[in-house]
Swiss-Prot record:
Membrane-crossing segments per the record: 31-51, 82-102, 112-132, 138-158, 179-199, 211-231, 353-373, 381-401, 409-429, 437-457, 478-498
Keyword Repressor (UniProt): no
Name recorded for this polypeptide: Nucleoside transporter 2
Extracellular side: 52-81, 133-137, 200-210, 374-380, 430-436, 499-502
Amino acid sequence: MTTSSDSAMVNHTPSPWYKFGFKSFAEFNTYVTFVFLGMSIMMVASAVTSAPDFLTRYYVYATGDPDAVAETPLFWNNANTFYNAGTYVLQVLTELFSLTPFMRRIPLSVRLFVGLGIPFAELLLIIIVPAATIKSQHGAIAVIMVVACVGGFSKALCDSCTNALVGPFPTKFMNGAQWGLTVIALLMSIIQIILKVSMGTSFHDILTMSRIYFGICIGIQLFAIFELAILRFNPFAQKYIAEYRAGAQRNAQNNESTLEETAPSMNEPAAGDIADLPATVDDKERALNEEEGDEVRAVTSEEFHVKRGAVLTATGDADKMVDLDQTGNITSTEQLLRASAASVFKRVYPMLVCVFLIYFTSLLTFPGVFFLVSTTSGWYMTVIVTLFNAGDFISRMVLMFRPLRPSPKVVVAGTLGRLIIIPFLVLCVRGIIRGEALPYVLITLLGLTNGYFGCMACIHCPRTTTLRYAGERSLAAMLSGISIMLGLCFGSNLSLAITLTH
């Protein structure tokens, strides 16, 4: 393969408005798959966080004693914060390990299926323990922390692999995966409110609600696995996921060999043979059917000498570029192994810093510090969680419209500007500003800015014209996931320290 430029323009024919920008069912189903993969990343965490009363009183249901008194009030009063801290610590470690050559050699689909399978064990454990009951409250604490740590591992696998898969796709697919993160959170909050309103508050009612609640989670997780399983056969997804494309071409070549043996007169071009392709096939389609030459695929040393923070000054549209390593016979593993994480980091680090700071601020204050506000309302915690999830959801929906997407420089400004929420929250916690109205306003703003600037910072990482290889885009997306986890980890642990010393 030879190429004279780093990118090629792809012809985009506008589709009717009622198709919402999708040109085929295969493209739409690919988008749906990434939404559900995003949902699966936060499935267990969102389910637990959206039912704060169930978690903080889990010792009652685990021991089967409706009159049980907390033996370790320090833990149970801050169960949500302890859960988040345990989850994010292990998730950060696993995500960092995912950058090593050893992990990159494991096929993405294998890692992703493992990550999607683990939540079943977590959800079943949460449900089964109250059904079987245990004698010790310390056992209930152990269950929560085991679920937190195992959940951190599974989330890391799902997050890193989903980011690696979606990185080379056009921007709207990255937005779909990011949107899925908050769709599940809002959905769990709505389900929790419906169940809380429609059912009683007795011991057995709460147990029934929890089984319905977590059963719905299991159903959604099953659908996500189904969507991932059929994604391998999706022709649109094969254009961008080298692992699936290589497998499809191997199958095509095997089928062609069989046909040649039974019908020698047939002379169909083999997969990867571009000699007979019609001239009307666009540049991207042609690149996908070319054979890869090692001398072309290796990233040249000149490409490592890039401007630091180039993402802030990049021009052009990454969606109109053809990545140089999107050829017919390369796999996703090879793309990842040939890209340099250091080179990618150098180009997109301003957005990575924004991602870290946004999620650090969010987890520093939510849910722990917001729950420290003095209130007599039994709905306060549920409303706080719902407002954050709703704001996060709405702002990510806004980003589906290209004109409303902020530039990298605006993302930097927004990241710094949202810090003004913190001093007002401190006034509420200290009782200087009383009531629930201001905390509700602040949590809504926190959710809106978390989704708008956080999601856009993650999108700018892989979808920048400073990256020219699919492997680089996958690594950039993985780095954004690591930045999220670092922000969540440090934010949740600092929040834990604040709540414990309050």
